Amino acid sequence: MSRNELDERIETYYVRVRGVVQGVGFRHATVREAHALKLRGWVANLEDGTVEAMIQGSGAQIDRMLAWLRHGPPAARVTEVTFEERQTERRFERFQQQ
C-alpha cells in the first residue's frame, strides 16, 4: 500500500436508490462496480422496493460510485439517489450483497 493510500481519508456513506431497482440485477451489478472501484460495504433490497447500501472508501471512489448508482445497470430505471455521510469507526473488509 502506498503512502498516499495510507494518508487518504476513509469515508462512509449510507445510500438509498429508488425506482425500478429490484429484480433487475441491481445488487449484483453494484457489487461488481464496488469491487472495480475497490470500495467496501454492502448492498441490500428493502421491502419498500428500494435498494440501500453502505459504501466505504476514499472520497474519489465514493463520488464515482454515486455517479454510477444514478443510472445503475441497463435494466434499472433509477428515479432518485439519496445519500448521507455516516461517522463510524467500523471498517468493512469487502463489499458484499446482503
Curated annotation (Swiss-Prot):
Q: Which residues are the active-site ones?
A: R27, N45
Task: Tell me the ranges covered by the Acylphosphatase-like domain, including all copies.
Answer: 12-98
Q: Which top EC class is given?
A: hydrolase
Enumerate the UniProt keywords alphabetically. Hydrolase
InterPro entries named among the record's database cross-references: Acylphosphatase (IPR020456), Acylphosphatase-like_dom (IPR001792), Acylphosphatase-like_dom_sf (IPR036046), Acylphosphatase_CS (IPR017968)
Pfam families in alphabetical order = Acylphosphatase
UniProt keyword Hydrolase present: yes
Q: Which reaction is recorded as catalysed by this protein?
A: an acyl phosphate + H2O = a carboxylate + phosphate + H(+)
Please name the SUPFAM superfamilies in this protein's record.
Acylphosphatase/BLUF domain-like
- Which branch of life, at top level? Bacteria
> Can you tell me which residues the record assigns to a coiled coil?
none
| Molecular-function annotations in GO | acylphosphatase activity
- The answer to whether keyword Aminoacyl-tRNA synthetase applies is no
The family note in this entry says: Belongs to the acylphosphatase family.
Under which name does UniProt file this protein? Acylphosphatase
Tell me the lineage of the source organism. Answer: Bacteria, Pseudomonadati, Pseudomonadota, Betaproteobacteria, Burkholderiales
